[in-house]
């Protein structure tokens, strides 16, 4: 019986390490894909309409908040790709608490960027969809449905990215804490 306990305690950290690495790789790949998809949807969102001979167009570049979200996702996607490469190097070199702490700081910074981009884009998207009767801002999404749907999909994918980065931040923090203890 003591032999089985020793065998379990030796294999458990290896299984835990493999699970941690698998989770990290999976969520980093999903974060990269979500960043690319969200940026692409936002950058390509535009619509031109003709209302009584007046041509109006809506583009992401007309809104600083939408530009911020698009470029935030580009930056986060690039840095997430670099962190994936860094993770592969960390796995090959072995467990060093400092490496996991750097991953934690990276994930926290990327998560903070995405939170800012999502908050800004959600605010302006809400105004576009519902308007604000107190200030006289009219809703535009009833006229620019295609543009608003693409922007809304982009923001939704950014929130998915935020969830992935939150999971990465929590797992990296947990791993760096366990390594130090």
From Swiss-Prot:
It comes from the Eukaryota. The keyword Hydrolase does not apply. Keywords: Cell membrane, Membrane, Transmembrane, Transmembrane helix. It is a multi-pass membrane protein. Residues 40-70, 122-152 are extracellular. GO terms for cellular component: plasma membrane. Residues 1-18, 92-100, 174-181 are cytoplasmic. The chain crosses the membrane at residues 19-39, 71-91, 101-121, 153-173. It is found in: Cell membrane. Homodimer and heterodimers. Belongs to the Casparian strip membrane proteins (CASP) family. This is CASP-like protein 1F1. The lineage of its organism: Eukaryota, Viridiplantae, Streptophyta, Embryophyta, Tracheophyta.
